[in-house]
Amino acid sequence: MDIKAFKMDGLGNDFVIIDQRSQDFNLDKDQIIKICDRSFIGCDQLILIKKNKEIDANVEFFNSDGSISGACGNGTRCVADLLSKESGKKEITLLTTSGSLKSKILGNNLVETEIGIPKVNWQEIPLSKQLDTQDLKIEIIDRNNTKHIGGIAINVGNPHIIFFVDDIEAFDLKNIGPKIENHPLFPEKCNVTLAKVINRNLIKVKVWERGAGLTKACGTAACATAVAANINNLVEKTTDIEFVLGSLTISIDERNSIHMKGPVSDIKNINIKL
């Protein structure tokens, strides 16, 4: 089977995007895993674009382990840019399993997406039992065997836990990430972020992405981190979240809705042979 696809990324968070509006086929879990495997094509997530007569398109997100992801901020921005270049429209609306997302094309490869209102109640994360989502009291241990207890849970289309620490490099996230992702407190697993507040307009982060592992960037993690920092009055309503290859600007408006702005890569056409 020959598949026409696109490769894009947002700050190194990379995607294989397949437009199923013009290609009639289905992919099973094993095929998704193969496409995402970096010994084959390779990506953090695979994205399917599907027809929608009411809005621009439906999108489905799959992690590199073949699992479904309810939301993907950087992926949404990439698809919005792709469809904008196809249609000439400067505003793109996409329907995801987590709801409708609107994006604005700002030029110079910048795209802003409204992610919506975050969820902070324990049932909405969801957690397996009732706890204070602003202090989960989960223990993580740094490279010096020093224990740190905390964790803030936020759902921005998918579940996240954020640990604010003094030094994000003091932790082995490759070791900690899968343990927290699969913690019994999270029945749907979770994304794990280590965050250091630099000032009231900047936070540095490292992310372990649910179903994908260590990633260079994660849009929803940036959103969840900004929300958690705002709740605790650590930053302003607009703040930059810095990853290895650059930053996303996260703003929280008067309705408490999250807006994410950042760059997307150029579009690369690829062919996949399965």
Curated annotation (Swiss-Prot):
It catalyses: (2S,6S)-2,6-diaminopimelate = meso-2,6-diaminopimelate. Pathway: Amino-acid biosynthesis; L-lysine biosynthesis via DAP pathway; DL-2,6-diaminopimelate from LL-2,6-diaminopimelate: step 1/1. It is found in: Cytoplasm. Belongs to the diaminopimelate epimerase family. Catalyzes the stereoinversion of LL-2,6-diaminopimelate (L,L-DAP) to meso-diaminopimelate (meso-DAP), a precursor of L-lysine and an essential component of the bacterial peptidoglycan. This is Diaminopimelate epimerase. PANTHER family: DIAMINOPIMELATE EPIMERASE (PTHR31689:SF0), DIAMINOPIMELATE EPIMERASE, CHLOROPLASTIC (PTHR31689). The gene is dapF.
